[in-house]
Amino acid sequence: MKITLGVAVAALAIGGLHYYKNADSKVQNIEETEEVAKVNPVGPSFNADSAYAFTKAQCDFGPRDMNSRGHDLCGEWIVSKFMEYGCKVTTQTATLAGYDGTKLRSRNIMASINPEATTRILLCAHWDSRPWADNDPDSANWRKPILAANDAASGVAVMLELARIIRKSKDEKAFNKQLGIDFVCFDAEDWGTPQWADVADNADSWALGAQYWSKNLPQGYEARYGILLDMVGGVGAKFYREGMSMQYAPEIV
């Protein structure tokens, strides 16, 4: 995907979504090294195999590019899984215009845990797939849709796994009822201008669902902070402290 829109993004960490905080809550210059930080996760364990299975399940629908049957079926599956894990699910539908004027049937999926809680955390990812493999080394594939296991079935899979383990924590009465969590699956993210198009790339042609959501928030909605999960399933992936997050939420990062 092409990141063009910040939606309350704080930080992304590997696996269990661990957060780091300086003792004095001040920004420090950190030298990037190859060393992996050792942390002690708090709370239920994140199951990587389960997240992998959720990723595969999405890919089994085939490409999830806009207006396709695979896209529609996968959307229904995502809704059913969040409901299975006790989330209150709402959808936000709209007809959006692609870079070339194509009408896109967009569906943002919002799943909430403890919807009555006023202190809320936002986690988000996009669930549509890129309709063109315009970065493929083989130009013969440039106009073919991609399966998109990493970009971005992996992000939705992480959210589903978190919903699953939080549901287990709630069943065991170990979850803070004063805290609400919102999972938002953005649609129409990756219909941005392809490299082979005869028009200039327009940043606003990307992240259409996120743009629509940010302009049509539920009345009174406010999240304390948010985490964007994008392309988190790559082999040997490394995630660094992101600049915008360090600027706006250093105490969380």
Task: For each feature predicted by the language model, list its residue ranges.
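Hydrophobic membrane-insertion alpha-helices, especially the h-region
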Residues: 4-16
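Sec-dependent signal peptide cleavage junction
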Residues: 20-49
